[in-house]
Amino acid sequence: MVKPRASRTREQVTANSDAGGYWTGTHTLHRLRFHLVWTPKYRRRVLEGAVAARLTALLHEACEIKDWQIHELSVQPDHVHLLLQVSPTDSIFSVMQVLKGGTSGRLRTEFPHLEEFLWGKHFWGEGYFAETVGQKEEAVLRAYIRNQGKKSEGSGVPDSAKPKKVRP
């Protein structure tokens, strides 16, 4: 099991979260929030019911241990959306290693019936999506994550997240 870092205390995180979400370190003031999305291998629709509930608990547990703050989380049958605040010492690669690697083995062990859908040694697909989130777009992104899986008019994708058309 990974030990919590001693670089900042829970009180510092909580106190600074109320002041615009900024965290402090020894010589730093930072607000690093990322929108992360990843999928099960083959984009199988296996994140439902007890599996989704357990994944949610495992993600909260991992983030508590690493001293990261979950701002929004949506587990859909075939993908996960997460709005996460981390420290400047955490690379996105290492964050995803903890989130995907730390949940993969436990989910496969606790739900052996998933072998039928996810053969091999991997639960998650290889890739992931990561983007930084500024204060201005955070409200739109939070609503987007909260409304995942709900029927709506239109695509449900914020205009800022839609691909831009480039004319030749």
Question: Language-model segments: which ranges?
Answer:
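Basic nucleic-acid-binding interfaces
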Residues: 1-168
